[in-house]
Amino acid sequence: MEHSLNSLNNFDFLARSFARMHAEGRPVDILAVTGNMDEEHRTWFCARYAWYCQQMMQTRELELEH
């Protein structure tokens, strides 16, 4: 269980990092990033990546408003 939780923490860190890169305008090939993941991890990772992208874009929009 601890190994699985550690893996999810690592995947979450990577999803957040790639979302930050995307928000900065740097190219992110999400298919290359998730290419070796099994379907369960790929689905989870892509959902977290999309959530972080949305959060970072909302933050960026708020910063531009002020």
From Swiss-Prot:
Gene3D superfamilies: Glycogen synthesis protein GlgS
GO BP of this protein: negative regulation of bacterial-type flagellum-dependent cell motility; negative regulation of single-species biofilm formation
Record-linked InterPro entries: GlgS, GlgS_sf
Pfam short name (any one): GlgS
Lineage: superkingdom: Bacteria
Record family assignment: Belongs to the GlgS family.
Function according to Swiss-Prot or TrEMBL: Major determinant of cell surface composition. Negatively regulates motility, adhesion and synthesis of biofilm exopolysaccharides.
HAMAP family reported for this sequence: GlgS
Name of the featured protein: Surface composition regulator
Species whose genome carries this gene: Shigella dysenteriae serotype 1 (strain Sd197)
Biological classification of the source: Bacteria, Pseudomonadati, Pseudomonadota, Gammaproteobacteria, Enterobacterales
Gene for this chain: glgS
